[in-house]
Design a protein with these regions (language model features):
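RNase H-like, metal-dependent nuclease domains and their acidic two-metal-ion catalytic environment used
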Residues: 1-131, 137-140, 144-145, 152, ...
């Protein structure tokens, strides 16, 4: 079963209008297997009042909300651990990305790069191992169940988190770079039911075997970017706008104990 539909991807193409400070951030899906590519997703997040799709007509949100803009995706050459680390640091400094807004895949050999980044750039650099369990957080504030109650493994949480940000317009993808490969990967990724009511996204290996195409590195890189914002952005996305609390006037009840005693015996 598909997770992300073509309509969701089509509706995500556009540019957000920020109305306050923006934070630059980046996520790297590192190359582990022969045909894998090192893919970087670079973006910004902040408070927005609307967005402009490809038709050029600005669309205002009902209420300003904190959103993520994917500005670009780029491939990096595969290098040895320290050389790869140096390239990531060079890029982060050039784009003024703080250590706490940088995320890398630390699966397998990626662990060495993540450790080197923590040592050379900052201990706040986030690392995600695709074999880890899903987190105990809610993807959306409306969710009644935590991620670890719905998804088998963090890799599943990553893709479903991305899907929800697309569906409820917390993520927009800039039309300024070629997105055909990203769209193909996003709409082709499948999942299946697993035991105990959990769902599991197919692995990269299974995806490649089924589709006979390249590894979905662009999709995974973007899913890491959304995860980074979710975990460190300090704002929880919601499906619906929170209803304002109604003020209910309560008339003060006067009990018998509040009356003074009057002696009528005389």
């Amino acid at each position: 079963m598909a997770i992300i539909t073509p309509a969701m991807m089509d509706n995500s193409m556009g540019s957000l209008r920020f109305i306050g400070p923006v934070v630059p951030l980046a996520a790297f899906d590192l190359a582990l297997e022969g045909r894998d590519q090192v893919v970087c997703s670079f973006g910004r997040y902040g408070l927005c009042d609307g967005w402009t799709p490809r038709d050029g007509q600005f669309r205002e949100f009902k209420k300003p909300k904190t959103c993520l803009q994917l500005d670009s995706q780029m491939q990096f050459p595969k290098l040895a651990t320290l050389e790869q680390t140096a390239e990531i640091i060079r890029f982060a400094k050039e784009m003024r990305i703080g250590a706490n807004w940088l995320c890398v895949d630390r699966t397998g050999n990626g662990a060495g790069i993540h450790d080197a980044l923590r040592s050379l750039y900052g201990s706040e650099v986030m690392g995600v191992n695709y074999s880890w369990a899903s987190s105990e957080t809610h993807i959306l504030g409306d969710d009644t169940q935590r991620a670890n109650e719905l998804y088998s493994g963090v890799v599943t949480e990553l893709i479903f988190g991305l899907a929800k940000y697309l569906e409820f317009e917390y993520l927009k993808i800039s039309p300024s770079f070629r997105t055909e490969e990203l769209v193909r990967q996003a709409t082709s990724r499948r999942y299946k039911q697993q035991g105990q009511g959990l769902v599991r996204v197919e692995s990269k290996g299974d995806f490649v075997k089924r589709t006979r195409q390249n590894s979905p590195d662009a999709l995974d890189s973007l899913s890491l970017l959304v995860y980074l914002m979710r975990q460190r952005g300090g704002v929880v996305a919601t499906m619906t706008e929170p209803k304002p609390e109604k003020f209910v006037f309560q008339k003060k009840h006067t009990g018998i104990e509040s009356y003074e005693f009057v002696d009528f015996s005389n």
